[in-house]
């Protein structure tokens, strides 16, 4: 925030200093400060550690709401070469950083960095697609963090013993993981599909290939979690939590999961009907 404020003051004083201040350099500093504030690579180092110390609802705010203002300001600056570097680093670090994580909050943090790379890439070439992507990402993140918050889930080993006798709820949780990863035909694939179309129209094939490969890595560790949780039963870990299922919260979660899984079909049906 201090860097952002200082750079803004320099930019305002530019005319009074007989143009001795390089405007592009000042804009680059402002852009770097905004990328730092949004948690994009290579300024992401604070983000996973901050996420680890927050409650799930506060973590959700950090992953979604706190990114709106920086992204809006970045869309006005749009220094493409700096954005391109941040996009490449964000999708790579967001994918690789989540591979060996056992903390769900850090896993969601690196997933957020990866998704932020997709948003920044769409922001480079379109003023509206990144908003659509942000909306769907916020919804899918809310569905997962809502369930994590209800059952106080913070580590992967808790998922292995979670709902041993309730396979349906466990199944819906991992479908939401795959939807967040952008696997078709779930709802999370729709914003990625829009970004892919936009980058294809702009002939950004190298960037698009790199982003899709990073998404495959994120899907790999999501699928690894799903496989481990379904194929193995850790009955000795059942002491981790006593499940007091609040029916209203569970019903709300299942409704949101329905939209997460079948949302793409519903939107496609609505599109072809009207």
UniProtKB/Swiss-Prot annotation:
The keyword Transport applies. It catalyses: a ubiquinone + NADH + 5 H(+)(in) = a ubiquinol + NAD(+) + 4 H(+)(out). It is found in: Mitochondrion inner membrane. Keywords: Electron transport, Membrane, Mitochondrion, Mitochondrion inner membrane, NAD, Respiratory chain, Translocase, Transmembrane, Transmembrane helix, Transport, Ubiquinone. The keyword Cell membrane does not apply. GO terms for cellular component: mitochondrial inner membrane. InterPro entries: Complex_I_Subunit_2, NADH_DH_su2_C, NADH_UbQ_OxRdtase_chain2, ND/Mrp_TM. GO terms for molecular function: NADH dehydrogenase (ubiquinone) activity. One of its GO terms (biological process) is mitochondrial electron transport, NADH to ubiquinone. Its EC number is 7.1.1.2. Its main location: mitochondrion. Signal peptide: none annotated. It is a multi-pass membrane protein. The chain crosses the membrane at residues 28-48, 54-74, 79-99, 107-127, 128-148, 171-191, 206-226, 254-274. It comes from the Eukaryota. PANTHER family: NADH-UBIQUINONE OXIDOREDUCTASE CHAIN 2. Core subunit of the mitochondrial membrane respiratory chain NADH dehydrogenase (Complex I) that is believed to belong to the minimal assembly required for catalysis. Complex I functions in the transfer of electrons from NADH to the respiratory chain. The immediate electron acceptor for the enzyme is believed to be ubiquinone. Belongs to the complex I subunit 2 family. This is NADH-ubiquinone oxidoreductase chain 2. It comes from Drosophila sechellia.
